[in-house]
Regions:
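Short acidic/polar inter-strand loop motif in beta-rich domains
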Residues: 135-146
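Short coil-to-beta strand junction motifs in C2/discoidin
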Residues: 57-59, 77-88
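Sec/Tat signal peptide C-region and signal peptidase I cleavage site
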Residues: 14-21
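Short, compositionally biased P/S/T/A/G/V-rich stretches that sit at domain boundaries
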Residues: 21-57
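Short amphipathic, basic-aromatic surface patches that mediate peripheral association
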Residues: 62-81
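Solvent-exposed serine/threonine-rich low-complexity stretches and specific carbohydrate-binding patches
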Residues: 101-110
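Aromatic sugar-binding surface patches on proteins
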Residues: 110-117
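Short tyrosine-centred short linear motifs in exposed loops/low-complexity segments
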Residues: 114, 122-128
Length: 180
């Protein structure tokens, strides 16, 4: 067989073998301060380093905040670029309950790109309200610093003020864990 043809067959075979977990959207993407914030969930996932979040067997979902720059971003990020060094807090309430689930998403990367996320244990199937609180890089004094040019020639606009986005979604389960 011709080497180029063989390479093409191997490439197609490898691409077909790539598994992608099914992401379920939560509401519609929202736009704030030159950013698009998209909420999704999927099956809970094993993560590295070990201990950074709940193990898949102890969680119901892996929730994500996909935050990328819009063309109007005034902080120097090109369109569709991931925005790093944010603090993204979440709060989840199930309809009919006053109990809240809350935490802070961690920055991470997967085969579909950078995002903030966490493995979360919900309160069973039902309707949920979900709130993200998005804080700029300078709002977390305990984190690493992320510099911002402020001079007239190379500077960018000041960081945005913290804001919330809210979503509602119905959780019916995700099927067999690990059954992508």
């Amino acid at each position: 067989m011709h080497p180029i043809a063989l390479a093409g067959i191997i490439t197609v075979a490898n691409a077909a073998g790539i598994a992608h977990a099914v992401e379920y959207p939560i509401g519609k993407p929202q736009q704030r301060y030159g950013m698009e914030i998209t909420a999704v969930y999927l099956q809970p996932l094993p993560m590295e380093p070990d201990g950074m979040m709940k193990k898949p067997q102890d969680a119901d979902v892996h929730m994500e905040a996909d935050i990328k720059a819009l063309a109007s971003n005034a902080n120097g990020f090109p369109e569709d670029a991931w925005i790093p060094y944010l603090t993204v807090k979440y709060e989840i309430t199930k309809q009919g309950s006053s109990e809240k689930i809350s935490g802070v998403f961690m920055p991470m990367v997967a085969n579909d790109g950078h995002h903030y996320g966490d493995n979360i244990k919900l309160m069973g199937p039902g309707k949920y309200k979900f709130k993200y609180s998005v804080l700029p890089p300078n709002a977390n004094p305990g984190s690493h610093h992320f510099g911002r040019h402020t001079d007239r020639l190379t500077g960018v606009r000041p960081w945005f003020k913290p804001f919330d986005v809210e979503y509602e979604f119905t959780y019916a389960g995700i099927g067999k864990k690990g059954g992508y």
